[in-house]
């Protein structure tokens, strides 16, 4: 299944979550797109709620269904709560870490930076967005890429880095200190609904 490439603004409004991370999609019209706009009152079934939650998280991380399901299955083989393990695995993806460090303004930008070879892990170039970052590993920007406008501007406006990460803006180097806790990850996601969706 191909990655979704349609309007993120419409998709954000339909799902009720900012897929870009900027929140701009919901500022003027915080309701689903369509003819009836804010007057839509369609009640979702249990399956519909589960599907919507799955789609929210999948589109948030910009993953194909196969990538998303594979990560979900890997999380199920780990000790602990399946849903929480899943959220932690997603947050440990290289593109997610690059975004959380503030090197990109959106997750899509972060994925592109990785794809184009601008990001190093422990000093070695890694161009796989799904690469799973491990605690104590360092993430940095390739020297030739450090003056890219997208990176410079992102770092300038970013004023928050999660506690499970360390970041030095001068050297554009971050450290994945530890695995994140569930409370440090997107609160607008109910991962239990996703577990129920795949358990049907």
From Swiss-Prot:
Segments crossing the lipid bilayer: none
Pfam families per record: Ribosomal_S4, S4
Species, as recorded: Staphylococcus aureus (strain MRSA252)
UniProt entry keywords in alphabetical sequence: Ribonucleoprotein, Ribosomal protein, RNA-binding, rRNA-binding
Organismal lineage: Bacteria, Bacillati, Bacillota, Bacilli, Bacillales
Cited NCBIfam families: PRK05327.1, rpsD_bact
Record's function text: One of the primary rRNA binding proteins, it binds directly to 16S rRNA where it nucleates assembly of the body of the 30S subunit. With S5 and S12 plays an important role in translational accuracy.
UniProt key word Ribonucleoprotein: yes
Subunit: Part of the 30S ribosomal subunit. Contacts protein S5. The interaction surface between S4 and S5 is involved in control of translational fidelity.
GO biological process terms held by the UniProt record: ribosomal small subunit biogenesis; translation
Domain S4 RNA-binding: 92-155
GO molecular function, one term: structural constituent of ribosome
Family: Belongs to the universal ribosomal protein uS4 family.
Protein name as annotated: Small ribosomal subunit protein uS4
Disulfide-bonded cysteines: none
Domain of life of the organism encoding this protein: Bacteria
GO cellular component: a single term: small ribosomal subunit
């Amino acid at each position: 299944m191909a990655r979704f490439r349609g309007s993120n603004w419409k998709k954000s409004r339909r799902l009720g979550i900012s897929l870009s991370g900027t929140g701009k999609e919901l500022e003027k019209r915080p309701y689903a797109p369509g003819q009836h706009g804010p007057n839509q009152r369609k009640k979702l079934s249990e399956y519909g709620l589960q599907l919507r939650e799955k789609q929210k998280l999948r589109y948030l991380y910009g993953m194909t269904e196969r990538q998303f399901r594979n990560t979900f299955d890997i999380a199920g083989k780990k000790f602990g709560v399946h849903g929480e393990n899943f959220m932690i695995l997603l947050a440990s993806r290289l593109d997610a870490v690059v975004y959380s460090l503030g090197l990109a303004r959106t997750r899509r930008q972060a994925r592109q930076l990785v794809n184009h070879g601008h990001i190093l892990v422990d000093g070695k170039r890694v161009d796989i967005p799904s690469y799973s970052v491990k605690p104590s590993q360092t993430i940095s920007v390739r020297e030739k890429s450090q003056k890219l406008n997208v990176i410079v501007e992102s770092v300038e406006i970013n004023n928050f880095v999660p506690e499970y990460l360390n970041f030095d803006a001068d050297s554009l180097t971050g450290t994945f200190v530890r695995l994140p806790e569930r409370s440090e990850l997107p609160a607008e996601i109910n991962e239990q609904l996703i577990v129920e969706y795949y358990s049907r």
